[in-house]
């Protein structure tokens, strides 16, 4: 037998670990570092291993483990776990109908005071009955048929938010706590991400994840699932002399005993408060960290609950007021694609019409090829479609047991859509990307607005006056199909557009004309090649010097450009391999868009090649962007901070800490005049 000191230490460790468990899992406010928690836990494990007689039913070490079960034993509930009635009207009228029934049963006149109710969430998980004797969790059972459930004690012990021992010195002799085991959305997503990374099966949704975990025959598997629990009522109670007289006070008391209770609850004075609660939760439903399918109203006073009694298997004093379902079953009638403004081809399932999330849904996104493969969704399949709030409906799972025979073929975007359905350009899927894309960025109608706005933007062709509203008009009236069409717009056409008088039209024509004289770097950036930003565009311009040299470069040649990797090289090569894009580039050149060209760094390096510069302060003549462009055109790199690797710091007025750092490190400091002198022999590269 262990001596008293060992017994006392084990008991103290159990209390301390459970206190930290409550703070971490229930309050979400850890009180000690993980390493210290692990030290306490391992100390208790070692004590119990050395003294098996010390192992108690409420020990934290008993949460996870145990032998796999052959099956679940039936458990008869001391107090039946009855279901509550569901109000079919999901509007405010549903709450009013419940209030009318309650007041009628209680014999209240219209002039009598309002009934006090308790309102709470209807969690979307698995109902569980927890039995505590002398404050220790001794059994847990599912609802079952209401009279008899299944013994899931071993699995429930693995749920970290469920206390194995109640707080307080004088718990009731018997206390049955009823509530819901569920899975938070973030825990669900995190678990599925880990499963996918390990190549293991994922869970369909949080509800199935919670129910399936509790009904695992192997408690070790249940212990790996991130489950949570909230209490919402009582079963059998013995020896609780100061038991509360209302439902709301009971939930407060349970919280005081260490049992998790949702904060999303209130005591309501009459039906108007119920409706306000219902509407408030409805507005925030999608922001809650877990799934719910409605709210529950209960007459608050237990004395009135007893007076109202039951109707067959349902209490007259409670009702579930549901929201429109966010998930439903339907059938996939076909799979097509939607071409987005960036050229992404998103697979879309055409569905047999189904009412979900308050609307009739006929289409749902399948996201990308990886998601189609993961869910194995095919035409003819029965699927679970979800629509939450304003979120685009999506297919969350395929019901494989209902797949038609013979099995329909798998869907593959590149096989079904080798060319873009909008413009006929080639469709590709870059290595490492989940999305298939149209390569006709300058030509594709679906990408037209985005391509035009990017082409005219300040850092690209810098056409002042070309904004979203103008582009909307130009595209909707079919005046512009590609960027080349901007250079053909007549004055009278522009002057006839909304909010475009003749003076504005003349200014725009002048801006378009001015933009014809540009730099090769700006022109490359303006083309909107995927993965090619300003810096890469400048690197390409410096390296090749001339557009024709770039057009003739294969992926191997592109990999020779500074900071261009395989994905960027592939993206550039595929863009210029698309005839539609080359056609637009040719038209732009024919319409007078031009730039200075050089032999490129393939044959001659820039004067600042391999040098790193830092800009600080305000320069007298050059803007920061202009200075950066000149430096990069000369082969230099502009960094954001000063280090030992910095070659020059260019300082203007009100230079700050970067200048001080440069002096400290002995870095050469230039003013604007000295920078321009250094760049003097490289002006032709701008």
Swiss-Prot record:
Amino acids binding NAD(+): 34-38, 83-84, 120, 143, 180, 298, 322
Gene Ontology CC: one annotated term: cytosol
Binding-site positions, Zn(2+): 420, 423, 438, 444
Family (UniProt): Belongs to the NAD-dependent DNA ligase family. LigA subfamily.
Required cofactor(s): Mg(2+); Mn(2+)
Protein name in the entry: DNA ligase
One family name in Pfam for this protein: DNA_ligase_ZBD
Active-site residues from the entry: 122
Species this protein is from: Thiobacillus denitrificans (strain ATCC 25259 / T1)
Function, in words: DNA ligase that catalyzes the formation of phosphodiester linkages between 5'-phosphoryl and 3'-hydroxyl groups in double-stranded DNA using NAD as a coenzyme and as the energy source for the reaction. It is essential for DNA replication and repair of damaged DNA.
Disulfide bridge map: none
Biological process, per Gene Ontology: DNA repair; DNA replication
EC number: 6.5.1.2
Keywords: DNA damage, DNA repair, DNA replication, Ligase, Magnesium, Manganese, Metal-binding, NAD, Zinc
Residue ranges annotated for the BRCT domain, each copy included: 603-686
GO molecular function: DNA binding; DNA ligase (NAD+) activity; metal ion binding
């Amino acid at each position: 037998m262990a001596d008293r000191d060992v017994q006392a230490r084990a008991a103290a460790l159990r209390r301390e670990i459970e206190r930290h468990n409550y703070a971490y899992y229930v309050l979400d406010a850890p009180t000690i570092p993980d390493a210290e928690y692990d030290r306490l836990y391992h100390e208790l494990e070692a004590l119990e291993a050395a003294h098996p007689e010390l192992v108690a039913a409420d020990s934290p070490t008993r949460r996870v483990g145990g032998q796999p079960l052959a099956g679940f034993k039936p458990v008869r509930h001391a107090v039946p776990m009855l279901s509550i009635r569901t109000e079919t009207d999901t509007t405010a009228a549903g709450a009013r109908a419940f209030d009318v029934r309650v007041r009628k049963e209680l014999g209240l006149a219209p002039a009598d005071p309002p009934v006090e109710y308790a309102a709470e969430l209807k969690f979307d998980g698995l109902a569980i009955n927890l039995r505590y004797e002398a404050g220790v969790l001794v059994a847990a059972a599912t609802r079952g048929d209401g009279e008899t459930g299944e013994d899931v004690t071993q699995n429930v012990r693995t749920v970290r938010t469920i206390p194995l021992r109640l707080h307080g010195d004088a718990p009731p002799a018997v206390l049955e706590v009823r509530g819901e085991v569920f899975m938070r959305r973030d825990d669900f997503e995190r678990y599925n991400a880990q499963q996918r990374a390990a190549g293991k099966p994922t869970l369909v949704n949080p509800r199935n994840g919670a129910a399936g975990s509790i009904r695992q025959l192997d408690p070790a598997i249940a212990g790996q699932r991130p489950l949570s629990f909230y209490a919402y009522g009582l079963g059998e109670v013995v020896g609780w002399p100061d038991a509360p007289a209302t439902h709301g006070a009971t939930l407060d008391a349970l919280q005081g005993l260490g049992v998790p209770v949702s904060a999303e609850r209130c005591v309501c004075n009459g039906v108007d408060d119920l409706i306000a609660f219902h509407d408030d939760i409805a507005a925030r439903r999608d922001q809650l960290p877990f799934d719910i399918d409605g709210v529950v109203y209960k007459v608050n006073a237990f004395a009135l609950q007893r007076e109202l009694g039951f109707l067959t298997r349902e209490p007259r004093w409670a009702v579930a007021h549901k929201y429109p379902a966010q998930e439903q079953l339907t059938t996939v009638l076909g799979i097509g694609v939607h071409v987005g403004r960036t050229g992404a081809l998103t697979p879309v399932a055409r569905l047999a019409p189904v009412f979900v999330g308050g609307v009739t849904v006929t289409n749902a996104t399948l996201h990308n090829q990886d998601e189609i493969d993961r869910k194995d969704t095919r035409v003819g399949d029965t699927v679970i479609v979800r629509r939450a709030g304003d979120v685009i409906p999506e297919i969350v799972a395929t019901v494989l047991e209902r797949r038609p025979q013979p099995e329909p073929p798998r869907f593959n975007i590149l096989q079904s859509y080798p060319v873009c359905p909008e413009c006929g350009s080639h469709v590709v899927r870059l290595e490492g990307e989940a999305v298939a894309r149209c390569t006709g960025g300058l030509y594709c109608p679906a990408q037209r607005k985005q391509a035009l706005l990017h082409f005219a933007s300040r850092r690209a062709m810098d056409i002042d006056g070309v904004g979203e509203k103008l582009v909307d008009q130009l595209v909707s009236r079919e005046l512009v199909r590609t960027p080349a069409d901007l250079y053909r717009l007549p004055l009278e056409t522009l002057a006839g557009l909304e909010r475009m008088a003749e003076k504005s039209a003349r200014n725009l024509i002048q801006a378009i004309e001015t933009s014809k004289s540009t730099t090769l770097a700006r022109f490359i950036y303006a083309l909107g090649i995927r993965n090619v930003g300003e810096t890469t565009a400048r690197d390409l311009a410096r390296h090749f010097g001339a557009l024709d040299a770039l057009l003739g470069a294969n992926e191997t040649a592109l990999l020779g450009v500074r900071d261009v990797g395989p994905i960027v090289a592939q993206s550039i090569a595929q863009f210029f391999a698309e005839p539609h894009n080359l056609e637009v580039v040719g038209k732009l050149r024919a319409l007078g868009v031009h730039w200075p060209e050089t032999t490129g760094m393939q044959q001659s390096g820039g004067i600042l090649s391999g040098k790193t510069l830092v800009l600080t302060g305000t320069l007298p003549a050059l803007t920061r962007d202009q200075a950066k462009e000149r430096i990069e055109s000369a082969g230099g790199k502009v960094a954001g901070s000063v280090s030992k690797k910095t070659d020059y710091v260019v300082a203007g007025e009100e230079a700050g800490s970067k200048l001080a750092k440069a002096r400290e490190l002995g870095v050469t400091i230039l003013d604007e005049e000295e920078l321009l002198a250094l760049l003097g022999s490289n002006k032709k590269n701008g």
